[in-house]
Amino acid sequence: MTAVSLGMPAVPPPPLASRRASRQIMVGPVPVGGGAPVSVQSMTTTLTADVNATLQQIAELTAAGCQIVRVAVPSQDDVEALPAIARKSQLPVIADIHFQPRYVFAAIEAGCAAVRVNPGNIRQFDDKVKEIAKAAGDAGVPIRIGVNAGSLDKRLLAKHGKATAEALVESALWECSLFEEHGFRDIKISVKHNDPVVMVRAYRQLAEACDYPLHLGVTEAGPAFQGTVKSAVAFGALLAEGIGDTIRVSLSAPPVEEIKVGTAILESLGLRERGLEIVSCPSCGRAQVDVYKLAEEVTAGLEGLPVPLRVAVMGCVVNGPGEAREADLGVASGNGKGQIFVKGKVIKTVPEGQIVETLIEEALRLADEMGAELPDELRSLVGGATVTVH
């Protein structure tokens, strides 16, 4: 029988545009730019001087899939903690420096993988560029020129009237030119704004004006929901155009949540191999099962499953069979029962009360066949063990 295409997206979908050509820098062992995969990073929320707490949070970020971590360095106590953190961290550490240029040199000496400088608030920054360029160049440490709308140089604010896209780009390119005068080009740039529209305009201009790798970010994006929406809109627009080499989602939430959102954005654009993906319908008057409950229970039951698996949880016979058939695993529900699909074929029909248990068992079986290293709590369920649904 001839296969019929249902017009479903490829898994993963192809990128929407070719990546922008850029220089490549190395942040520790992580390549940024030059065609390297887009990396996901975050920033610790601990007091950096509290070495144990900071390293614990870095360990949590590592487990969540973070690739680069940034730590704030506002005080001498934080500076003194940097050597231990840089040495023991599982991730390359970027020191985030404001106000004090001497902290830049201390961070380089401490073994940090990179240093972020804010040209808008470091005292006499332009006068220190020659020394910073030499120290960073000798140590092989890249510099991120991190321009932020909230701390833009007063001269540029006076010139442009406010923190426009043009003002952000002008600040970044000016500082780049100072480093270039001293032969230093191991640079990446960010031009962050809390308005996604201004941010997108700024990065588009920057992408046209230089070939440095770009760190994407919406600054002060807000609480989890609002920040997720802003970041997804801005990052999606730019990454779909091939712009962006590393991303940091800024949320007023635990840093691990930033990694989850950032990774999901990349997966959605085909820039990262998909992990577990739950496809579920929004429900409507046609639904004859509680789709919300089913989707939540399947998601909870498969949390931590380390495989690129698409699971469809559908509530009626209109779109349900098509979605379920195109997924790796799925259910089309109706009349108090569910048809279970695996790789496009119906393998069984089960009562509504067994849908979640069956989907979880089949997902774990597929993961096991793929050679996945399952967490102990999931591996114990492979082979038909009872699944407890809460």
UniProtKB/Swiss-Prot annotation:
It is an enzyme of class 1 (oxidoreductase). One of its GO terms (molecular function) is 4 iron, 4 sulfur cluster binding. GO terms for biological process: isopentenyl diphosphate biosynthetic process, methylerythritol 4-phosphate pathway; terpenoid biosynthetic process. It holds the Pfam family GcpE. Pathway: Isoprenoid biosynthesis; isopentenyl diphosphate biosynthesis via DXP pathway; isopentenyl diphosphate from 1-deoxy-D-xylulose 5-phosphate: step 5/6. [4Fe-4S] cluster binds at C281, C284, C316, E323. It catalyses: (2E)-4-hydroxy-3-methylbut-2-enyl diphosphate + oxidized [flavodoxin] + H2O + 2 H(+) = 2-C-methyl-D-erythritol 2,4-cyclic diphosphate + reduced [flavodoxin]. Its cofactor is [4Fe-4S] cluster. Its EC number is 1.17.7.3. Keywords: 4Fe-4S, Iron, Iron-sulfur, Isoprene biosynthesis, Metal-binding, Oxidoreductase. CDD domains: Aldolase_Class_I. Converts 2C-methyl-D-erythritol 2,4-cyclodiphosphate (ME-2,4cPP) into 1-hydroxy-2-methyl-2-(E)-butenyl 4-diphosphate. This is 4-hydroxy-3-methylbut-2-en-1-yl diphosphate synthase (flavodoxin). The lineage of its organism: Bacteria, Bacillati, Actinomycetota, Actinomycetes, Micromonosporales.
